[in-house]
């Protein structure tokens, strides 16, 4: 009986340790500073209507959102943006000459706050842009940027370039209450911030405009910025192999292993590292990083391996 109690106690303690580890791994996101910005156009989508509506999955209970009503072919700015916790900042936003400002008419009294945020939009293309400046210190180097876009048509590809990083929304339907990556929102992780500024541009000058309904900025936790394999595929008999390269931010420990558990010694200096691998079969590599604050992040890349047929050499392919 005493042995059974001891075993149960050990299982209980292991459960506590596992739970604690998972909790500590997520503390970076819990402490993140966020700024939410919504566009208001038309007569129905108003700040008062937002406050009276039920919370949604994007605009959650108790969160503070900043609103701006852009004017077509003009510069419209808002200053003193607040975080979702209601803390005032020096951040500001400027819609610079959007060519089109519209309300989709999807918001009504029985809809939640997500519908209001997706109701109104400003369209940008060419030199028209959105500039968010004087970001808080937590976003001084990098920032996660979420852009929510839903125009008044159901067949538009909308490009977004944010400080050199690019994502596309393929808008194929009106907002129906669910957010889907690539369909009505895009997420750009670890966007490099330039002198406290984030600049968003849309489609090219000869194309239709990219819609901006809402933008959310999130201060990032320490983690992996990028992890790539070049080339992603190697052939049997190739001596060059593939180069794995990575970039991390504020991480004190970085390790590399294959998905089946083989450890690969690596060195990371100033947040960057690289190593050449030459697997003899398709192999997935796992990069693990521990941030200075204890947060953990993981990224994977796969190097595909192609077997040659008889009488072939790599030069024949």
What feature does the model see in each segment?
Residues 271-284:
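Solvent-exposed segments in extracellular or luminal domains encompassing
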Residues 306-315:
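Conserved small/polar residues in nucleotide/adenosyl-binding loops
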Residues 232-240:
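Short, solvent-exposed loop/linker segments at the N-terminal edge
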Residues 290-294:
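Short, solvent-exposed loop/turn segments at the edges of extracellular beta-sandwich modules
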Residues 247-253:
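Short proline/glycine-enriched turn/loop motifs at strand-loop junctions of beta-rich domains
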Residues 264-271:
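Short beta-strand segments within Ig-like beta-sandwich modules, predominantly Fibronectin type-III
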Residues 222-229, 308-309:
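Proline-enriched interdomain boundary motifs that mark the N-terminal boundary
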């Amino acid at each position: 009986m005493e042995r059974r109690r001891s075993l149960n106690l050990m299982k209980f303690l292991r459960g506590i340790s596992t739970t604690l580890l998972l909790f500590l791994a997520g503390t970076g996101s819990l402490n993140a500073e966020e700024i939410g910005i919504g566009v208001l156009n038309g007569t129905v989508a108003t700040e008062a209507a937002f406050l009276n509506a039920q919370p949604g999955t994007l605009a959650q209970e108790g969160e503070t959102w900043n609103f701006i009503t852009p004017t077509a072919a003009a510069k419209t700015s808002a200053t003193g943006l607040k975080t979702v916790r209601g803390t005032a900042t020096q951040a500001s936003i400027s819609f610079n000459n959007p060519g089109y400002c519209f309300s989709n008419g999807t918001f009504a009294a029985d809809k939640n706050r997500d519908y209001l945020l997706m109701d109104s939009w400003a369209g940008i293309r060419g030199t028209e842009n959105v500039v968010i400046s004087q970001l808080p210190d937590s976003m001084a180097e990098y920032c996660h940027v979420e852009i929510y876009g839903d125009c008044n048509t159901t067949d538009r590809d909308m490009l977004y370039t944010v400080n050199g990083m690019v994502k596309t929304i393929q808008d194929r339907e009106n907002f129906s209450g669910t957010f889907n990556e690539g369909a009505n929102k895009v997420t750009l992780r670890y966007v490099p911030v330039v002198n406290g500024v984030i600049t968003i541009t849309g489609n090219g000058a000869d194309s239709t405009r990219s819609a901006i309904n809402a933008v959310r900025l999130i201060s990032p936790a320490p983690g992996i910025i990028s992890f790539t394999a070049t080339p992603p595929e190697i052939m049997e008999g190739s001596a060059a192999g593939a180069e794995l390269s990575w970039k991390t931010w504020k991480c004190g420990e970085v390790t590399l292993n294959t998905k089946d558990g083989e450890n690969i010694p690596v060195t990371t200096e100033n947040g960057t590292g690289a190593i050449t691998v030459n697997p003899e079969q398709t192999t997935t590599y796992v990069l693990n990083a521990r941030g200075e604050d204890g947060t953990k992040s993981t990224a994977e890349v796969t190097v595909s391996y192609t077997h040659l047929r008889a009488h072939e050499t790599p030069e024949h392919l």
